């Protein structure tokens, strides 16, 4: 299967971002607005929009997307970064909360894996996955953690009303 222009562009941007190397500039000479828009759309659909942005930053300015698209892309990346900080804050709070109840948490996937990326806040995550356990094997830490999470959820809902 032959990749189209936008797909080739996206893979080149991702390769650059993940390997911290410059993008092959030749691929970006004379790129149409439509190709840039399709590249952006594909990056969003695949959850790699911020990583693609990192690749764009290695291109000479004259080969980067048109200004309007570039501004939208930059604002979307900023939103990724804000969400990432919110996730990190929530994970820290949740881990501290469970610790006060004798439950240890281990973060799985998502934000936890982001530390392996050149810019951790540019790895998209949709939720927070944790594994819970207790040093006291007589306790059912998963059931206790679920009960506590339900309690937090109900309290949070009451605060919003």
Spell out what each predicted region is.
Residues 90-149:
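Active-site nucleotide-donor binding segment shared across nucleotidyl transfer reactions
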Residues 83, 91-93, 149-160:
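Conserved catalytic core of two-metal-ion nucleotidyltransferases
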Residues 13-14, 158:
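Conserved short internal alpha-helix adjacent to the catalytic or cofactor-binding core
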Residues 2-3, 82, 142-146, 156-158:
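Non-catalytic regulatory/linker segments of enzymes
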Residues 2-8, 19-109:
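Helical scaffold of the NTase/Pol beta-like nucleotidyltransferase catalytic core
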Residues 34, 112-114, 153:
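Short amphipathic alpha-helical surface micro-motifs
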């Amino acid at each position: 299967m032959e990749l189209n222009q936008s797909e080739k562009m996206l893979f080149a941007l991702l390769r650059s971002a993940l390997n911290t190397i410059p993008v092959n500039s030749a691929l970006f000479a004379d790129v149409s607005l439509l190709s840039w828009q399709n590249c952006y759309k594909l990056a969003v659909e695949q959850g790699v929009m911020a990583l693609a942005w990192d690749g764009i930053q290695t291109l000479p300015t004259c080969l980067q997307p048109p200004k309007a698209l570039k501004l939208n892309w930059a604002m979307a990346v900023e939103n990724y970064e804000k969400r990432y900080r919110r996730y990190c804050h929530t994970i820290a709070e949740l881990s501290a909360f469970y610790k006060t109840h004798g439950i240890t948490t281990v973060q799985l996937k998502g934000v936890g894996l982001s530390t392996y990326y050149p810019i951790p806040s540019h790895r998209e995550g949709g939720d927070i996955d944790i594994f819970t356990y207790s040093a006291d094997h007589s306790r059912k830490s998963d059931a206790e953690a679920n009960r506590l999470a339900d309690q937090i959820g109900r309290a949070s809902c009451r605060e919003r009303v």
